Amino acid sequence: MTKRPVGVIGATGMVGQRFLTLLAEHPYFEVTALAASARSAGKTYKEAVGNRWKLDIPMPEKFADMTVIDAANIDEMKKLCNVVFCAVDMKKEDIRALEEAYAKAEIPVVSNNSAHRWTPDVPMVIPEINDAHLAVIADQRKRLGTKRGFIAVKPNCSIQSYVPMLTALLEFEPYEVVATTYQAISGAGKTFNEWPEMIDNVIPYIGGEEEKSEQEPLRVWGKVENGQIVKATSPVITTQCIRVPVTNGHTAAVFVKFRKNPTKEQILKAWKEFSGKPQALKLPHAPEQFITYFEEDNRPQAHLDRDIYGGMGVTAGRLREDSVYDWKFVGLSHNTLRGAAGGAVLIAELLHKEGYFD
């Protein structure tokens, strides 16, 4: 099978680096173009990254000597690839314009950015949960005047630590959710070397994160109506998002009230059996088991459990009845794999299999 030529925009940043490690030996995709800011353009990838390689695995050799292109040079990118992954660090309105320009140039965009998460006809997808939202792509193409180009996005990294578990329990009608997230420093694109003030420290604020963590799940659970996604109205979610001194892995402590209160056995069965289109299609980055539950009192732990199924599975533990709410549990996801680049690659695998890139 001939691999599809793809590009990575924002290739020099942490999420861009993660994209390249995931795509280096991909069965469907071949990275043929790397793009970044104008100041990196013309340099080799190795030169452009310099001493800013942020991952604990080495830079794939095959990309080191590739020449970086200016992300704004869409004509040049179009000669080299026909799908792009986007992880640029720019102002939101600039990202919105850039992604739309690529889509209008008939290059589908799979984005890690938040700029288009609330554009009504742009699907914001966790592939196991709301693949049905891909149906709005036809309407988006009409709006953009494209035959092939479109934008698909993934949601915020924080919500992957509790939304899968809540989705598996929607039949029991959760109506009130409290979630406190404990978020790794890589969520800010940083390492301890770059952010020494996070060592031995907790910062009780992450700008914009609580609004995303409360509202984005409702869009994921929304319905497609008249060519756009209409968000769900329930459950009500309130969150606090806290930065903690962990390299990777977002943890969530969650409390839930249900209209049809399930038993512990029903909850555990729902989590164990929950799977979606990626598992049915056996997509390359689909975890065999989407939600893994640990019986041990001291799990899940970021250090031990974030890399389950290559960082694409999510884990849960400490499921207990609660004296104020009905149930409480702890969830964990890998924020730069399932929550960022890995989640976007899984979306692209699904789009590829379903014919959206043809």
What role is predicted for each listed range?
Residues 1-205, 235-236, 308, 314-315, ...:
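N-terminal Rossmann-like NAD(P) cofactor-binding subdomain of oxidoreductases
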Residues 186-358:
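Charged docking surfaces used in two-component/phosphorelay signaling
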